[in-house]
Amino acid sequence: MAIYAVVGTQWGDEGKGKIIDFLSSKIDYVVRFNGGNNAGHTIVVNDKKFIFNLLPSGVLQGAKCILGPSVVIDPLILIQELEVLKNNNIKTEIFISDKAHIIMPYHIKFDELSEQKKGIHKIGTTKKGIGPCYADKINRIGIRTIDLLNTEIFANKLKTNLEEKNQIIEKIYNDKPLDYDDILNTYKKYIEILKSLITNTEKILHHAINSEKYILIEGAQGTMLDIEHGTFPFVTSSNTLITAAAGCGIPISKIKQKIGIIKAFSSRVGSGPFVTEISNSIGDIIREKGQEYGSTTKRPRRIGWLDLLTIKKAIALNELNHLALTKLDILNNIESLKICIAYEFQGKIYDYIPTSCETIEKVKPIYKVFKGFKEDISNIKNYDDLPIEAREYIEFIEKEVGIQISILSVGSEREKTIFRNQEWSNI
């Protein structure tokens, strides 16, 4: 038995999808433990691109897929993704936790109206209803998948919630109320499609652990978007750390292989402090070469140099023991590369990320500058064949964070991967 966990070390979009995809080849179960359809992951197989927002990345390898209790589910999006599997003749088993919460139309409406009302102070959400759904969960009025299995219970909860939500929509936001019958009838159709997938996933996972199955736990977004430890309030609405996987019913002590994914540069979507942001043409070049546009929103991502303070924080919080570096190939033909090693503000040097966003906005990055490499590295298979400049960049990261980078991604396709030890190449 082995239980692997994969998390992002930055603001999401690190390339977790590709790494998870090939790790899943010998995995029995892939478990998604947080987030909703605000998190997009892209996988390229045989030159065909797949983009999923809810289904785990490992679904393409035939592993059994579990959407855990802390995932919030938009039924329409999930049904559309199941259709993609069907249309591409991808066969797998999907299990939805009966404790997972359901995104309702009023959640999406609230997300849109709230962002509009904030104006220039908006968070930059995906407007998918994620935050309002988690808010209802914490407020103990959310609708769970188990409620969908009893039409009377679902209808009553919807009626109670919608009466309150429509009051707010009309009186606070001066907008049109949502129609109860329309929502009920639409969701009844969703229920017919999804009801056979809803089950006690905790029981399934306990049986898998006792049967010594291989399990891969997949996190959405990244450490710096964690609701507790990220750049609050410019964060997501769930816990993105490996510790949140306990919500699936898997004891943290069972997770021995903890893999952090680092993109060779930084990016973030939406508002919030971004110390290493590149505000010149180099940022534009990296964005276009790396196709750094949100797979969910299509919004252009903000681009920055690699920030080691975020990586060190992610390693400490997640207790990572393995690292994978992605998109190194995107950095070729750039004259100088930079890595942020500390912050400075009013003569004070920070070797950690301040808690206050107001402080983070004011700090200046302290950089280590590296000579760039010109070669196209996308077809290189062995580490020693990389340009010396690329190896110096990688080895500096390793020296600073104290963990070897075991996996290097030099292209979006599965085969464009360099393994630095036998353990990973045999998976």
Curated annotation (Swiss-Prot):
<dbReference type="InterPro" id="IPR001114">
    <property type="entry name" value="Adenylosuccinate_synthetase"/>
</dbReference>
<keyword id="KW-0963">Cytoplasm</keyword>
<feature type="binding site">
    <location>
        <begin position="12"/>
        <end position="18"/>
    </location>
    <ligand>
        <name>GTP</name>
    </ligand>
</feature>
<keyword id="KW-0479">Metal-binding</keyword>
<feature type="binding site">
    <location>
        <begin position="327"/>
        <end position="329"/>
    </location>
    <ligand>
        <name>GTP</name>
    </ligand>
</feature>
<keyword id="KW-0436">Ligase</keyword>
<feature type="binding site">
    <location>
        <position position="13"/>
    </location>
    <ligand>
        <name>Mg(2+)</name>
    </ligand>
</feature>
<feature type="binding site">
    <location>
        <position position="301"/>
    </location>
    <ligand>
        <name>GTP</name>
    </ligand>
</feature>
<feature type="binding site">
    <location>
        <position position="40"/>
    </location>
    <ligand>
        <name>Mg(2+)</name>
    </ligand>
</feature>
<dbReference type="GO" id="GO:0046040">
    <property type="term" value="P:IMP metabolic process"/>
</dbReference>
<dbReference type="GO" id="GO:0005525">
    <property type="term" value="F:GTP binding"/>
</dbReference>
<dbReference type="InterPro" id="IPR042111">
    <property type="entry name" value="Adenylosuccinate_synth_dom3"/>
</dbReference>
<comment type="function">
    <text>Plays an important role in the de novo pathway of purine nucleotide biosynthesis. Catalyzes the first committed step in the biosynthesis of AMP from IMP.</text>
</comment>
<dbReference type="InterPro" id="IPR042110">
    <property type="entry name" value="Adenylosuccinate_synth_dom2"/>
</dbReference>
<protein>
    <recommendedName>
        <fullName>Adenylosuccinate synthetase</fullName>
        <ecNumber>6.3.4.4</ecNumber>
    </recommendedName>
</protein>
<comment type="similarity">
    <text>Belongs to the adenylosuccinate synthetase family.</text>
</comment>
<dbReference type="InterPro" id="IPR042109">
    <property type="entry name" value="Adenylosuccinate_synth_dom1"/>
</dbReference>
<feature type="active site" description="Proton donor">
    <location>
        <position position="41"/>
    </location>
</feature>
<feature type="binding site">
    <location>
        <position position="140"/>
    </location>
    <ligand>
        <name>IMP</name>
    </ligand>
</feature>
<feature type="binding site">
    <location>
        <begin position="295"/>
        <end position="301"/>
    </location>
    <ligand>
        <name>substrate</name>
    </ligand>
</feature>
<feature type="binding site" description="in other chain">
    <location>
        <position position="126"/>
    </location>
    <ligand>
        <name>IMP</name>
    </ligand>
</feature>
<keyword id="KW-0460">Magnesium</keyword>
<keyword id="KW-0342">GTP-binding</keyword>
<feature type="binding site">
    <location>
        <begin position="40"/>
        <end position="42"/>
    </location>
    <ligand>
        <name>GTP</name>
    </ligand>
</feature>
<feature type="binding site" description="in other chain">
    <location>
        <begin position="38"/>
        <end position="41"/>
    </location>
    <ligand>
        <name>IMP</name>
    </ligand>
</feature>
<feature type="active site" description="Proton acceptor">
    <location>
        <position position="13"/>
    </location>
</feature>
<feature type="binding site" description="in other chain">
    <location>
        <position position="221"/>
    </location>
    <ligand>
        <name>IMP</name>
    </ligand>
</feature>
<keyword id="KW-0658">Purine biosynthesis</keyword>
<feature type="binding site" description="in other chain">
    <location>
        <begin position="13"/>
        <end position="16"/>
    </location>
    <ligand>
        <name>IMP</name>
    </ligand>
</feature>
<dbReference type="InterPro" id="IPR027417">
    <property type="entry name" value="P-loop_NTPase"/>
</dbReference>
<dbReference type="GO" id="GO:0005737">
    <property type="term" value="C:cytoplasm"/>
</dbReference>
<dbReference type="GO" id="GO:0000287">
    <property type="term" value="F:magnesium ion binding"/>
</dbReference>
<dbReference type="GO" id="GO:0004019">
    <property type="term" value="F:adenylosuccinate synthase activity"/>
</dbReference>
<dbReference type="InterPro" id="IPR033128">
    <property type="entry name" value="Adenylosuccin_syn_Lys_AS"/>
</dbReference>
<dbReference type="InterPro" id="IPR018220">
    <property type="entry name" value="Adenylosuccin_syn_GTP-bd"/>
</dbReference>
<comment type="subunit">
    <text>Homodimer.</text>
</comment>
<comment type="pathway">
    <text>Purine metabolism; AMP biosynthesis via de novo pathway; AMP from IMP: step 1/2.</text>
</comment>
<keyword id="KW-0547">Nucleotide-binding</keyword>
<feature type="binding site">
    <location>
        <begin position="409"/>
        <end position="411"/>
    </location>
    <ligand>
        <name>GTP</name>
    </ligand>
</feature>
<feature type="binding site" description="in other chain">
    <location>
        <position position="236"/>
    </location>
    <ligand>
        <name>IMP</name>
    </ligand>
</feature>
<dbReference type="Pfam" id="PF00709">
    <property type="entry name" value="Adenylsucc_synt"/>
</dbReference>
<feature type="binding site" description="in other chain">
    <location>
        <position position="299"/>
    </location>
    <ligand>
        <name>IMP</name>
    </ligand>
</feature>
